[in-house]
């Protein structure tokens, strides 16, 4: 769900209210640059990839651990709104041509 413009998760009975600003500024910068460089926005929903899986792709590439909620916060900051904010693992309107997804499809990450 979104509260006050920020993601908040308690759908599985465990609260995840950590946000991106709880990382040090350099890590925040790396994460936001990675999101902007690795996802191409589209108009239709892409249900193939969840926030939970995508955060692991990012972690594999840059070594920065994020909670699911922190990753969702980064996506919101970069303008990627969830298809359904009431789901635990958000889906986005991102293209299969996005660099992160192309790397996944080629087996270049998350081995």
Regions found by a protein language model. Give the residues of each.
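Structural motif detector for alpha-helix initiation sites
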Residues: 50-51, 68
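Short, flexible active-site loop motifs that bind/organize anionic cofactors or intermediates
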Residues: 18, 44, 61
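Charged low-complexity interaction tracts in eukaryotic proteins
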Residues: 3-20, 77-111
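Charge-enriched amphipathic alpha-helical scaffolds
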Residues: 61-85
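Residues in intrinsically disordered, low-complexity segments of regulatory proteins
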Residues: 13, 33, 51-52, 89
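Positively charged, polyanion-binding regions of nucleic-acid-associated proteins
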Residues: 23-49, 55-57, 74-76
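Short strand-loop junctions, especially beta-strand C-caps/beta-turns
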Residues: 57-60, 95
